[in-house]
Amino acid sequence: MSDFDDLQFTLHRISEQRRTEQELCEGLLNGLYRALRTAGGRGQPLNNVSMDIVPDPWRRLVPVPLGEFHAAWFRLGLCEVLVRVRLHGEEFHGEFGNNGVFRVTDLDDDSMDALARQVLREVTSMYQGVQPEDLQLN
């Protein structure tokens, strides 16, 4: 088997895992979107929140290898923030904005609500010039 054939075989062999990982990461991004839409309170969806799933701007390989980031731009009224997430074992690792980071193990509503609050707090702090170590997190 040539090196080229080995590459094609490997890509084919892990294609289902890649697809599953992409669905899970996009599930987190969609859950965050729903949580941000309801950040105004139950029954009061925010109409000025939108999400566009995009290729990760730092992506260097296509298709995306296992463990790499999946991304979306979130429009939060007057600003936009890039959120990147990847699956690391059974935990999601993510980053957003200039230096925001998060880890999530569950995709339930409570976890997504907590993540939405964290993103909103930290993005607000980024605009206010507050350093991440000054933030009071959960």
Language model: regions and residue ranges:
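Mixed-charge, Lys/Arg-enriched low-complexity segments
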Residues: 1-11, 15-16, 125-135
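Alpha-helix boundary/N-cap detector
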Residues: 2, 16, 20-23, 27, ...
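Acidic-enriched, low-complexity/disordered segments with a strong bias for Aspartate over Glutamate
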Residues: 3-6, 52, 56, 106-113, ...
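Negatively charged, low-complexity tracts enriched in Asp/Glu with abundant Ser/Thr
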Residues: 9-73
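Generic hydrophobic secondary-structure signal
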Residues: 25, 29-32, 80-83, 119
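Short N-terminal secondary-structure initiator segments
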Residues: 34-53, 90-108, 119
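Intrinsically disordered, low-complexity regulatory segments enriched in Ser/Thr/Pro
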Residues: 60-115
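Extended, compositionally biased alpha-helical segments that mediate assembly or anchoring
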Residues: 95-97, 101-105, 113-138
